[in-house]
Regions:
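Short beta-alpha junction loops
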Residues: 1-3, 130-131
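Conserved inter-motif catalytic segment of the P-loop NTP-binding fold
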Residues: 2-99
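Phosphate-binding/switch region of NTP-binding enzymes
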Residues: 104, 108-187
Length: 187
């Protein structure tokens, strides 16, 4: 969902960290933040050849190919070992399949993603949003869509504001962990 023109700004802030971000006022007096030109260049040099962005909005309808095929090709062509797909609903828009409803399509897509991850020994992060107005205590059941999304995942992580946190803080919770078994870990 992140527009390609915001990607560099977003990732630069994440990589720079709070110690390398400065505050300034724009011509209207609003408070803004920036990474210095020197640090932006250092960051750009570091991630050059490491980050590849695919924006489906820039591809003509008849040129689109399966996102799964694109993912596999990028792994093979560039040696990528971490893939971030934001988000499941957008990814499904790129998949033409024979599945009848959206839950079947979600299940099939996640199964195929899981196979790609295992086949090439890569990490695939799939963003899936929470259900609206869901009140279950199980984080995995709060994922919007097919139950196969969390069933097939090796790890599920919830990201939220948290009621008792400072406004600038967020909560990460591991609710499923097939690698190490620890869940309900907060950080």
């Amino acid at each position: 969902e992140l527009p390609n023109y915001l990607f560099r700004s977003w990732i630069d802030f994440q990589l720079a960290g709070g110690d390398h971000i400065t505050e300034y006022r724009n011509k209207w007096g609003d408070r803004n933040y920036k990474v210095s030109d020197t640090n932006r260049q250092l960051i750009a040099d570091w991630y050059r050849g490491k980050c590849f962005l695919y924006d489906n909005r820039t591809v003509e309808g008849d040129e689109k190919e399966s996102l799964l095929a694109i993912t596999e090709n990028v792994i093979l062509q560039y040696g990528v070992d971490v893939i971030l797909l934001d988000n499941l609903m957008t990814a499904l828009d790129l998949e033409q399949g024979t599945a009848f409803d959206k839950y079947d399509r979600q299940s099939l897509f996640v199964k195929k993603l899981s196979r790609i991850a295992l086949k090439y020994n890569v990490l695939i992060l799939l963003v899936a949003h929470k259900r609206k107005n869901n009140f279950t205590a199980n984080e995995n059941d709060e994922i919007s869509g097919s139950g196969d999304i969390s069933n097939l995942a090796t790890i599920t992580i919830a990201y939220e504001k948290g009621k008792d946190l400072h406004p600038g803080q967020r909560l990460l919770k591991v609710s499923k962990n097939r690698l190490f078994g620890k869940t309900e870990t907060k950080g």
